[in-house]
Amino acid sequence: MNILLANNKLRYLGGTETYTYALAAQLVKTGHRVEAFTFRKGLISDRMKRDLGVPTTNATGKYDVVLANHSTTVKALREKKAGFIIQTCHGVTTALEQPSPFAHAWVAVSKELSAHVEAITEVKTPVILNGIDCHRFKPVNPAGEKLTKVLSLAHDDALNDVLQDHFKKYGIKLFRLNKRKNPVWDVEKQINQADMVISLGRGAYEAMACGRPVLVVDRRPGRELKGDGIILPENIEELIACNCRGQAYQNTNIAEMVKTAVENYSPRLGEWCRQYALENLNIGKQTEKYIALCKKLIWYMY
């Protein structure tokens, strides 16, 4: 298929940006012709061109399908008559993530989002989870038998200070990696140096794919602290239903979440995380779902 991937920006590291890269890589790998559309080029679009041979285009041609992530790109590409547009919605609150009336169909990355999109569009919205490249994000160094090093991918400095103090009480070191301040492309190397990772959303999934237990908590700019605690077999479905964004439990008790994470830590939990990622978050499986949906919808429309 001739496929156009669209993202508002491909300039810096971000959730939808790395998602777009992973999807592009898998589509190219499986024989599809892929191009990208964005309003702001940069690090990600450059990597897509260099690593994958995926060029950034003004979308003057016609595509079999457009897989777009933001309402801005949907509107622009509908005006260009670029092709059948499927918008993937990644968030509930951000204006860019709201379902656009200019899309032909919608996909949501979680059950929570699916319900949100359906309430607006009155159209049944399938769920396709965030896809992770499990060949790239994989266990290289095994997690330690004892929890000694935690990597925080949280954005909020004040939260990281509090987390560091709490982990220090257990003799555990906390290291920080904020993609806004010190972006690192090959974050999987940093993840593999830690025993546990703190993150939300896609960062949590990447850590799981690397075989690391994950503590879901962060405070994003202009938003309240949100946490779901440590990901466990007994709560994973509830957390995944909200894209592991801290919305399932909305826990604000950091001391309690850290204590529970420390008590439940085990390298075996990391092994379970890896297996879950392979079975449910693998970009190969998610891409297959997109292609099947594309064929179904395009056949129905035409």
Where are these regions (language model features)?
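Conserved donor-binding/catalytic core segment of Leloir-type glycosyltransferases
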Residues: V107, V127-D133, N141-Q164
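Catalytic binding pocket for nucleotide-activated donors in carbohydrate/polymer assembly enzymes
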Residues: G203-E263
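Acidic anion/phosphate-binding donor-loop and adjacent secondary structure
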Residues: L96-P99, A115-I120, G131-K146, W185
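A short, glycine/small-residue-rich beta-strand->loop->alpha-helix junction that serves as a flexible
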Residues: N7-Y19, A158
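A charged, aromatic-enriched C-terminal amphipathic alpha-helix characteristic of glycosyltransferases
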Residues: G15, C244-M301
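Acidic donor-binding loop of glycosyltransferase active sites
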Residues: K189-Y205, R212-P213
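A short, active-site helix/loop in glycosyltransferases that binds the activated sugar's phosphate group
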Residues: E97, A103-K124, D161-V162
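Active-site proximal beta-strand in glycosyltransferases
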Residues: Y63-H70, E79-T94, H104-A108, V217
